Amino acid sequence: MPAIVLIGAQWGDEGKGKATDLLGGRVQWVVRYQGGNNAGHTVVLPTGENFALHLIPSGILTPGVTNVIGNGVVVDPGVLLTELKGLEDRGVDTSNLLISADAHLLMPYHVAIDKVVERWAGSKKIGTTGRGIGPCYQDKIARIGIRVADVLDEQVLAEKIEAALEFKNQVLVKIYNRKALEPAEVLENLLEQAEGFKHRIADARLLLNQALENDEAVLLEGSQGTLLDVDHGTYPFVTSSNPTAGGAAVGSGIGPTRITTVLGILKAYTTRVGSGPFPTELFDEHGAYLAKTGGEVGVTTGRARRCGWFDAVIARYATRVNGITDYFLTKLDVLSSLETVPVCVGYTVDGKRVDEMPMTQSDIARAEPVYEELPGWWEDISGAREFEDLPAKARDYVLRLEELAGAYVSCIGVGPGRDQTIVRRDVLAAR
């Protein structure tokens, strides 16, 4: 069976956890392929239990699914162990979690540098979560990072930590006037933490390819969203990895020809956390309504999300750069009780109409939305389970978004619960 990629098609927080949870019972493997604990997935079970996950794949809540933290992820050992304990304390079986030997470890000096650099940036800050994600990826690209497998060889680990701190301490002490970190202390803490996850280390790329050869279904789960991709997002206000579909193959070790379905997650409106351009952002009572009704607070950071109307320009862009075959539209229920629902169908930049994503950062920052007004609906749709159960105006809204985005809306979320989903097309059987 081929692999399926699940990605955010906006600026993250689209509801990927709900989509993964929906498909989790029908796949054998769920893989997180990039990012770190700078993003969160929320899963609400039929019992009403709410789980917020940051590093661990959403499939951990589905019995019989093997979950993998892939080589493209940066892993904070302390966060990993805390998250595991939190799940186990609530009765979740975590024995089905594996960690790629090639994933990079997020170290204390990454967090220290991330926080101090962002603080010094002042008004020019990017809006990082301060979790050390960027500095960890910097070390990975510079080939001086520490990988998960390094904890299996204490001598190698000690040498790598000492070499890293020889430079990192110079930065912390001489540039930012911060206290130096002791190599022996960092090593001791990491070795102690490693006792809690060493048994999970695996050759993930081998296991995943063998699974596909055995006709098992593999779901590749991205964090953040397309517009936060370091290459294809609104740079420099982006993350340090590739949440887009191309990153799924690199971050898991699966060949790209194995992937036949790319499921994009779209919120029925748009949100963003942190700094950066946001053409449809609202500063009026409508923005406040979306934030309150949609519960728009970041799972990981606790920061309030910026809210705006649906942006079809970025949806079309996401469809193209990811090769999206299907969409999961979430939070349609939040739009109930609005008289009209504006949809951004294009921009004006310096008075000129633009229907596609502007090429430059400065043009995106100056983009003004061009809206198409769609009629709203007043009915409560949280109980709808078939597309025909939706009011006609809600159906028209979905079909118009589908037309503008350029890919079929296969699933629709009408509430936070696992069962509050309309399935128009089975994405696992579609190809």
UniProtKB/Swiss-Prot annotation:
**Is Aminoacyl-tRNA synthetase one of the keywords UniProt gives this record?**
no
GO CC entries: cytoplasm
Q: Where in the cell is it found?
A: Cytoplasm
GO biological process, any: IMP metabolic process
Q: Which residues are listed for IMP binding in this entry? A: D13, E14, G15, K16, N38, A39, G40, H41, T129, R143, Q224, T239, R303
The catalytic activity of this protein is classed by the Enzyme Commission as: 6.3.4.4
Entry binding sites for Mg(2+): D13, G40
* PROSITE patterns linked to this entry: ADENYLOSUCCIN_SYN_1 (PS01266), ADENYLOSUCCIN_SYN_2 (PS00513)
Give the metabolic or biological pathway: Purine metabolism; AMP biosynthesis via de novo pathway; AMP from IMP: step 1/2
Task: Give the cofactor binding note.
Answer: Binds 1 Mg(2+) ion per subunit.
Where along the chain is the active site annotated?
D13, H41
Give the superkingdom in one word. Answer: Bacteria
Q: What is its main location?
A: cytoplasm
- Tell me any Pfam family this protein matches: Adenylsucc_synt
* Gene3D superfamilies cross-referenced by the UniProt entry: Adenylosuccinate Synthetase, subunit A, domain 1 (3.40.440.10), Adenylosuccinate Synthetase, subunit A, domain 2 (1.10.300.10), Adenylosuccinate Synthetase, subunit A, domain 3 (3.90.170.10)
What this protein needs as a cofactor is: Mg(2+)
Keyword terms of this UniProt record: Cytoplasm, GTP-binding, Isopeptide bond, Ligase, Magnesium, Metal-binding, Nucleotide-binding, Purine biosynthesis, Ubl conjugation
Give the GO molecular function terms. Answer: adenylosuccinate synthase activity; GTP binding; magnesium ion binding
- Residues annotated as binding substrate: V299, T300, T301, G302, R303, A304, R305
- Subunit comment for this entry? Homodimer.
Q: What does this protein do?
A: Plays an important role in the de novo pathway of purine nucleotide biosynthesis. Catalyzes the first committed step in the biosynthesis of AMP from IMP.
Classification via PANTHER family: ADENYLOSUCCINATE SYNTHETASE (PTHR11846:SF0)
Q: What protein is this chain from? A: Adenylosuccinate synthetase
Q: Which organism is it from?
A: Mycolicibacterium smegmatis (strain ATCC 700084 / mc(2)155) (Mycobacterium smegmatis)
Provide the gene name from the record: purA
